[in-house]
Amino acid sequence: MKTLLLTLLVVTIVCLDLASTMICYSHKTPQPSATITCEEKTCYKKSVRKLPAIVAGRGCGCPSKEMLVAIHCCRSDKCNE
């Protein structure tokens, strides 16, 4: 019985740890291919404000506003495509 409880405890801890990370795209090309595991709960995508098809960067977190750059922040895995 103690072994079963210990096993359940370990599984719970592992599952909670996996749930605390996110997967975000992390690159500067239009093709979303490279991913990174993030501790933050948000992903971002930067693009040129007047030319949204030009991606200036993707990654973890939510950076502050910049002139001439549109920043889209989101809160789910691979949401910054």
From Swiss-Prot:
Family annotation (Gene3D superfamilies): CD59 (2.10.60.10)
Signal peptide limits: 1-21
Keywords, comma-separated and alphabetical: Disulfide bond, Secreted, Signal, Toxin
One Pfam family from the record: Toxin_cobra-type
Lineage top rank: taxon: Eukaryota
GO CC terms: extracellular region
UniProt family annotation: Belongs to the three-finger toxin family. Short-chain subfamily. Orphan group XI sub-subfamily.
Record-given protein name: Toxin F-VIII
Originating species: Dendroaspis angusticeps (Eastern green mamba)
Lineage of source species: Eukaryota, Metazoa, Chordata, Craniata, Vertebrata
